């Protein structure tokens, strides 16, 4: 006797979120030499291209630049005067902002028997931020799909955040994979 075919985790409601996006969000401050230097120290990469204007001027960049992940970090700072999310989010908040960096709800309506977790990020750096840049981001759900893992069925979603400077040039693209695991 054949077992009945399980319903797909990719329902019409789940499929409908593909292409949905946030409003653009712009950094509250211009990128500064001090912020770049502090970030490079925090990630323990003190290359002179991140803080020495004379050395950096002689490189292919023509001046000081920020390490690749700086852009992703910089836009995520909350504006002055806003509430700390640790005080406003639910107790089980994992620090991941399902609203996307640009704000506005970007959640996937998985079936109720699903529990979600962070499946990883891929950061594609196309250009490095420079002092004076104003960074803007916009997030969009680009893909949802299903696969079977050792523990059962999984639903996966990909949120793509594009970071640009004030000239509209793409600095980097972050691809976040969210995983929804079926609970039995």
Could you tell me what each predicted segment is?
Residues 2-120:
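Hot-dog-fold acyl-thioester-processing enzymes
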């Amino acid at each position: 006797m054949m077992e009945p075919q399980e319903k797909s985790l990719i329902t019409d409601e789940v499929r409908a979120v593909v292409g949905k996006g946030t409003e653009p969000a712009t950094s509250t401050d211009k990128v500064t030499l001090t912020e770049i230097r502090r970030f490079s120290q925090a990630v323990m990469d003190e290359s002179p291209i991140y803080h020495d204007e004379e050395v950096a001027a002689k490189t292919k960049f023509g001046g000081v630049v920020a390490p690749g992940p700086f852009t992703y970090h910089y836009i995520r700072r909350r504006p002055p005067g806003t509430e700390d999310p640790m005080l406003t989010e639910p107790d089980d908040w994992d620090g991941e902002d399902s609203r996307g960096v640009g704000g506005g709800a970007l959640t996937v309506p998985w079936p109720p028997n699903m529990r979600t977790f962070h499946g990883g990020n891929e950061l594609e750096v196309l250009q490095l931020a420079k002092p004076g840049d104003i960074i803007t981001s916009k997030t969009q759900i680009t893909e949802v799909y299903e696969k079977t893992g050792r523990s059962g069925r999984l639903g996966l979603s990909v949120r793509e955040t594009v970071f640009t400077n004030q000239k509209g040039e793409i600095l980097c693209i972050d691809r976040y994979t969210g995983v929804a695991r079926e609970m039995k």
